[in-house]
Amino acid sequence: MTARTDPGALRHDWTREELQALFDLPFNDLLFEAQLVHRRWFKADEVQMSTLLSIKTGGCPEDCGYCAQSSKFDTGLKASKLMEVEKVLAEARKAKEAGATRYCMGAAWREPKDRDMDMVCAMVEGIKDMGMETCMTLGMLSGQQVHRLAQSGLDYYNHNIDTSEEYYPKVISTRTYQDRLETLERVRNAGINVCSGGIVGMGESPSDRIGMLMTLANLEEHPQSVPINMLMPVEGTALGASEKIDPIDFVRLIAVARIAMPQSVVRLSAGREHMSEETQALCFLAGANSIFIGEKLLTTKNPEADKDQRLFAKLGIRSMPAHSCPSEKDVSADRKAG
């Protein structure tokens, strides 16, 4: 049975042909189907507001072609040390006051050092005590590090697959696609919710975008959170001169992600700064139900808060409460056990 005969049914056996057929539907039909799926599992007028903070910026030894924080590229970005716990918690309080219900923290590492885990876990615990969802993106993790994060009560771990397996070697050479999948499996097996998506506009083909969604939708469990990023080219990086993806194609991708992963929160991540209000509205209609608020996403620009507030008011959108994802796993037991 396909999603088209049972809107919102969970599947893990999507074929490339099925996903391509969805993408190729007449635009109105595709959005209608995505809305049917979306309304089965979520409130259609709710969008989660998240905030992303770079807790350790620059100096990363990886060569991800899109990233301003790679030490392989001259982007003018100065490397910094891991932020102090209290400073991170202070920023989290500001984010909550601004309306965020989810707090994400990113560190420019290949993988964290064991000596950093005490501070990282203290950040998680402090932010959870504020009542917000917590998410970390720290690169690859050892089994012991995953266990530490689970004990701290981390709700989500982000590790994007970035693109299709076929196109991946053209973007990154210092970490394999399989490395990423193994990290996701390690996180999932520890009981932490998975946040994983990708980036479009890196020169990949439409088929590569479908391949990326197929990989995510056919995982043992769908990622509870699926961020879709529109590349914001950074001068000095390998992909600094990339052309933008067509907005309608981007909306189509959001709709296919919603249909293929019906219980996942689909997040409009990087790139909103260059999206019109109309494009964002179509993305919400297609099933996107999370955004990042705040003036910066790690090192790139993001729409100012008042612009988002005006757009939400125009569209009649309300803030989604924390822990509204229907497939989210409760991590509180892990924290108590720790």
UniProtKB/Swiss-Prot annotation:
<feature type="domain" description="Radical SAM core">
    <location>
        <begin position="45"/>
        <end position="272"/>
    </location>
</feature>
<keyword id="KW-0001">2Fe-2S</keyword>
<keyword id="KW-0408">Iron</keyword>
<dbReference type="InterPro" id="IPR007197">
    <property type="entry name" value="rSAM"/>
</dbReference>
<feature type="binding site">
    <location>
        <position position="67"/>
    </location>
    <ligand>
        <name>[4Fe-4S] cluster</name>
    </ligand>
</feature>
<feature type="binding site">
    <location>
        <position position="104"/>
    </location>
    <ligand>
        <name>[2Fe-2S] cluster</name>
    </ligand>
</feature>
<feature type="binding site">
    <location>
        <position position="60"/>
    </location>
    <ligand>
        <name>[4Fe-4S] cluster</name>
    </ligand>
</feature>
<dbReference type="GO" id="GO:0051539">
    <property type="term" value="F:4 iron, 4 sulfur cluster binding"/>
</dbReference>
<feature type="binding site">
    <location>
        <position position="195"/>
    </location>
    <ligand>
        <name>[2Fe-2S] cluster</name>
    </ligand>
</feature>
<keyword id="KW-0949">S-adenosyl-L-methionine</keyword>
<dbReference type="GO" id="GO:0005506">
    <property type="term" value="F:iron ion binding"/>
</dbReference>
<comment type="similarity">
    <text>Belongs to the radical SAM superfamily. Biotin synthase family.</text>
</comment>
<keyword id="KW-0411">Iron-sulfur</keyword>
<protein>
    <recommendedName>
        <fullName>Biotin synthase</fullName>
        <ecNumber>2.8.1.6</ecNumber>
    </recommendedName>
</protein>
<dbReference type="GO" id="GO:0051537">
    <property type="term" value="F:2 iron, 2 sulfur cluster binding"/>
</dbReference>
<feature type="binding site">
    <location>
        <position position="267"/>
    </location>
    <ligand>
        <name>[2Fe-2S] cluster</name>
    </ligand>
</feature>
<keyword id="KW-0479">Metal-binding</keyword>
<feature type="binding site">
    <location>
        <position position="135"/>
    </location>
    <ligand>
        <name>[2Fe-2S] cluster</name>
    </ligand>
</feature>
<dbReference type="InterPro" id="IPR024177">
    <property type="entry name" value="Biotin_synthase"/>
</dbReference>
<keyword id="KW-0004">4Fe-4S</keyword>
<comment type="pathway">
    <text>Cofactor biosynthesis; biotin biosynthesis; biotin from 7,8-diaminononanoate: step 2/2.</text>
</comment>
<dbReference type="Pfam" id="PF04055">
    <property type="entry name" value="Radical_SAM"/>
</dbReference>
<feature type="binding site">
    <location>
        <position position="64"/>
    </location>
    <ligand>
        <name>[4Fe-4S] cluster</name>
    </ligand>
</feature>
<dbReference type="GO" id="GO:0004076">
    <property type="term" value="F:biotin synthase activity"/>
</dbReference>
<comment type="subunit">
    <text>Homodimer.</text>
</comment>
<dbReference type="InterPro" id="IPR002684">
    <property type="entry name" value="Biotin_synth/BioAB"/>
</dbReference>
<keyword id="KW-0093">Biotin biosynthesis</keyword>
<dbReference type="GO" id="GO:0009102">
    <property type="term" value="P:biotin biosynthetic process"/>
</dbReference>
<keyword id="KW-0808">Transferase</keyword>
<dbReference type="Pfam" id="PF06968">
    <property type="entry name" value="BATS"/>
</dbReference>
<comment type="function">
    <text>Catalyzes the conversion of dethiobiotin (DTB) to biotin by the insertion of a sulfur atom into dethiobiotin via a radical-based mechanism.</text>
</comment>
<dbReference type="InterPro" id="IPR006638">
    <property type="entry name" value="Elp3/MiaA/NifB-like_rSAM"/>
</dbReference>
<dbReference type="InterPro" id="IPR010722">
    <property type="entry name" value="BATS_dom"/>
</dbReference>
<dbReference type="InterPro" id="IPR013785">
    <property type="entry name" value="Aldolase_TIM"/>
</dbReference>
